[in-house]
Amino acid sequence: DKNCVLQAEGSDQWGNITTGIDLIRKKTGKEAYGFTMPLVLDKTGKKFGKSEGNALWLDKNKTSSYELYQYLVNVDDSLVIDYLKIFTFLSKEEIEEYERKNNEHPEAREAHIALAREIITDIRGEEEYLKAKKISDCLFKGDITLLDEDELEDAFKGAPSFDINVGDKVIDMLINAK
């Protein structure tokens, strides 16, 4: 229907690739092809994905831009340059410059911030990147009162919380906290 003749998957998905190629051939009568790409692993060698419970979603309703920003600026130093090479359209020279800066002043996190900027801007737009950066800057360097209600919700989505009633005693709240 979509004139698809290429099945692309992670290197651990060879069975899915061959099944996809067979399906394309049977449905269209056309030749189909497959290719694999290396898996993206975390610093412990664990792959990313739904089944691993550590998926990063393109859909901002599943992974907010702030969550994605925080993940990317906290990527292990040993992975950030590889991620710039894999996930961005930065030139070889730009990446080499970030690598130099990262080696000289890792605490500045310039490569990490570039990674977050490039990925979020590419998949969600500059406005989402700027919103995520604003939330992060307000929480970690500035004034949280500068955040609007939506930004606060993004910042604290998933944080442990519970409802309280006005007039409850502190001791009762502590006992009922989960």
Located regions from the model:
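Conserved nucleotide- and phosphate/pyrophosphate-binding catalytic cores
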Residues: I24-K178
